[in-house]
Curated annotation (Swiss-Prot):
<dbReference type="InterPro" id="IPR036121">
    <property type="entry name" value="ATPase_F1/V1/A1_a/bsu_N_sf"/>
</dbReference>
<keyword id="KW-0472">Membrane</keyword>
<keyword id="KW-0375">Hydrogen ion transport</keyword>
<dbReference type="InterPro" id="IPR027417">
    <property type="entry name" value="P-loop_NTPase"/>
</dbReference>
<dbReference type="GO" id="GO:0045259">
    <property type="term" value="C:proton-transporting ATP synthase complex"/>
</dbReference>
<dbReference type="InterPro" id="IPR024034">
    <property type="entry name" value="ATPase_F1/V1_b/a_C"/>
</dbReference>
<dbReference type="InterPro" id="IPR020003">
    <property type="entry name" value="ATPase_a/bsu_AS"/>
</dbReference>
<comment type="subunit">
    <text>F-type ATPases have 2 components, CF(1) - the catalytic core - and CF(0) - the membrane proton channel. CF(1) has five subunits: alpha(3), beta(3), gamma(1), delta(1), epsilon(1). CF(0) has four main subunits: a(1), b(1), b'(1) and c(9-12).</text>
</comment>
<dbReference type="Pfam" id="PF00006">
    <property type="entry name" value="ATP-synt_ab"/>
</dbReference>
<comment type="function">
    <text>Produces ATP from ADP in the presence of a proton gradient across the membrane. The catalytic sites are hosted primarily by the beta subunits.</text>
</comment>
<dbReference type="InterPro" id="IPR003593">
    <property type="entry name" value="AAA+_ATPase"/>
</dbReference>
<protein>
    <recommendedName>
        <fullName>ATP synthase subunit beta</fullName>
        <ecNumber>7.1.2.2</ecNumber>
    </recommendedName>
</protein>
<dbReference type="GO" id="GO:0046933">
    <property type="term" value="F:proton-transporting ATP synthase activity, rotational mechanism"/>
</dbReference>
<comment type="similarity">
    <text>Belongs to the ATPase alpha/beta chains family.</text>
</comment>
<keyword id="KW-0067">ATP-binding</keyword>
<dbReference type="InterPro" id="IPR055190">
    <property type="entry name" value="ATP-synt_VA_C"/>
</dbReference>
<dbReference type="InterPro" id="IPR000194">
    <property type="entry name" value="ATPase_F1/V1/A1_a/bsu_nucl-bd"/>
</dbReference>
Length: 482
């Protein structure tokens, strides 16, 4: 959409929190999703600049819009201007190494951005004929993920978990491992999460050289934040702003891009708030009636084309650990892989607390990953499943009442469970243990040795918080000498 040369000016007629009703001249109503701007001064003489997005046409030449920033200081009767186009954000190399808000304005206090090109945040998804369908595995260096829930290049992966089980830490580790190992660029969308986490992430990226603070355009990542303290309009649209930047790198620069979204649940939550403010009737559990459409509009744009790919890793907060809640349940339908985090494993001190039986991936097929990988993964899962079945018997009768074969299964399952833990680079400051990147070949070799019984003589503590199996063997020998 091209902005009209003739300025279309209306008047604010009502303000209810972040929702603004405006009246325009007859025949000049703005379109749905057009950006409206309000400029003026408040009662204290300070300059105001608020951007809104049209959501409803009310009749009587009035529209209802949702503000992307606070509406403090706005009054009825102020002029409101139709820009004639949707909200647009900067795209291209100028975005790298910088932090933007939902409107594409820099918020890192590093001066203006040299913007050469902008792109609207509302765009159609790529056509079916343009999509790339060849499945390729994406190595992350995290044992439990690479073995049991391999990620797809150009796929969508969800990190599901309740509060405090480690979603953001895993996401930061993936950024660290992949952005450093992977040649392409990344875009991080911080949707409705803690401001402190956003600040920590930025500083850690400078330390790990993912962001070059002296020459931002040499950086590997662009950051777009709409944090918890932002109005719901900003939190609802910041995911689209981040995605628009990622799409440019895919479609124009023809690169493989990584898109991190933390947290997709907050995107749904913001949509629910906006829906209520617009007066729509709520649906199941109080969510917006347009939940499926809202999630679909975002997810369908995250895909691989013949020009390049967007591999998306999305943290999904699970309210009250209930995976049947409409927000995580709707997100599930769009994903190629689900990494489910378990509070039970976190309480045992096993990090990353990935549930090896609850997590899934469409890539875990023999014709994609190969017979060796597939066989090892399934053997690990069946051993852990048998251990889970035996836990009730162990709790009532004790280990001694099990058969010799079952005792051996329990012993190996406990070693597998501990070997699925791993020290992270981003957690070094908390744990004091150096992080480890483990290749897929080393991961498969390690689990095969445990399953074959080659390491039955080692104590299970040797397998806890190590990288490769060679480290576990060395640690075991040291513990034996003790």
């Amino acid at each position: 959409m091209v902005a009209t040369t003739e300025t279309n000016v209306g008047k604010i007629v009502q303000i209810i929190g972040p929702v603004i009703d405006a009246e325009f001249p007859s025949g000049k109503l703005p379109r749905i999703y057009n950006a409206l701007t309000v400029k003026g001064t408040n009662s204290a003489g300070q300059n105001l600049s608020v951007t809104c997005e049209v959501q409803q046409l009310l009749g009587d030449n009035q529209v209802r819009a949702v503000a992307m920033s606070t509406t403090d200081g706005l009054v009825r009767g102020m002029d409101i201007v139709d820009t004639g186009a949707a909200i647009s954000v900067p795209v291209g190399k100028c975005t790298l190494g910088r932090i933007f808000n939902v409107l594409g304005e820099p918020v890192d206090e590093k001066g203006p951005v040299n913007v050469t090109e902008t792109s609207p945040i509302h765009r159609p998804a790529p056509k079916l004929v343009d999509l790339e369908v060849t499945p390729t595995v994406f190595e992350t260096g995290i044992k439990v993920i690479d073995l049991l829930t391999p990620y797809r290049q150009g796929g969508k992966i969800g990190l599901f978990g309740g509060a405090g089980v480690g979603k953001t830490v895993i996401m930061m580790e993936l950024i660290n491992n992949i952005a450093i190992q992977h040649g392409g660029v990344s875009v991080f969308g911080g949707v409705g999460e803690r401001t402190r986490e956003g600040n920590d992430l930025y500083n850690e990226m400078i330390e790990s050289k993912v962001i070059n603070a002296d020459n931002p355009e040499d950086s590997k990542i662009a950051l777009v934040y709409g944090q918890m303290n932002e109005p719901p309009g900003a939190r609802m649209r910041v995911g689209l702003s981040a995605l628009t930047m990622a799409e440019y790198f895919r479609d124009v620069s023809k690169q493989d891009v990584l898109l991190f979204i933390d947290n997709i649940f907050r995107f749904v939550q913001a949509g629910s708030e906006v829906s209520a403010l617009l007066g729509r009737m709520p649906s199941a559990v109080g969510y917006q009636p347009t939940l499926g459409t809202d999630v679909g509009d975002l997810q369908e744009r995250i895909t691989s084309t013949k020009e390049g790919s967007i591999t998306s890793i999305q943290a999904v907060y699970v309210p009250a650990d209930d995976l049947t809640d409409p927000a995580p349940a709707t997100t599930f339908a769009h994903l190629d892989g689900t990494t489910v985090l378990s509070r039970g494993l976190a309480s045992k001190g096993i990090y990353p607390a990935v549930d090896p039986l609850g997590s899934t991936s469409t890539m875990l097929q023999a014709d994609i990953v190969g017979d060796e990988h597939y066989g090892t993964a399934r053997a690990v899962q069946s051993t852990l499943q048998r251990y889970k079945e035996l836990q009730d018997i162990i709790a009532i009768l004790g280990l001694d009442e099990l058969s010799e074969e079952d005792r051996l299964t329990v012993d190996r399952a406990r070693k597998i469970e501990r070997f699925l833990s791993q020290p992270f680079f981003v957690a070094e400051v908390f744990t004091g243990s150096p992080g480890k990147y483990v290749t897929l070949a080393d991961t498969i070799k390690g689990f095969q040795m445990i399953l074959k019984g080659e390491l039955d003589s080692l104590p299970e503590q040797a397998f806890y918080m190590v990288g490769s199996i060679d480290e576990a063997i060395a640690k075991g020998e040291k513990l034996k000498k003790g």
